Amino acid sequence: GGETGGEGKGMWFGPRL
């Protein structure tokens, strides 16, 4: 999630990691 997809989504969602 976030800008790097660090949470596993691999998109622009979730916490910005």
Curated annotation (Swiss-Prot):
InterPro entries: Pyrokinin_CS. It is found in: Secreted. GO terms for biological process: neuropeptide signaling pathway. It comes from the Eukaryota. The modification Leucine amide is found at residue 17. GO terms for molecular function: neuropeptide hormone activity. Expressed in abdominal perisympathetic organs and abdominal ganglia. One of its GO terms (cellular component) is extracellular region. Belongs to the pyrokinin family. Myoactive. This is Pyrokinin-5b. It comes from Pycnoscelus surinamensis (Surinam cockroach). The lineage of its organism: Eukaryota, Metazoa, Ecdysozoa, Arthropoda, Hexapoda.
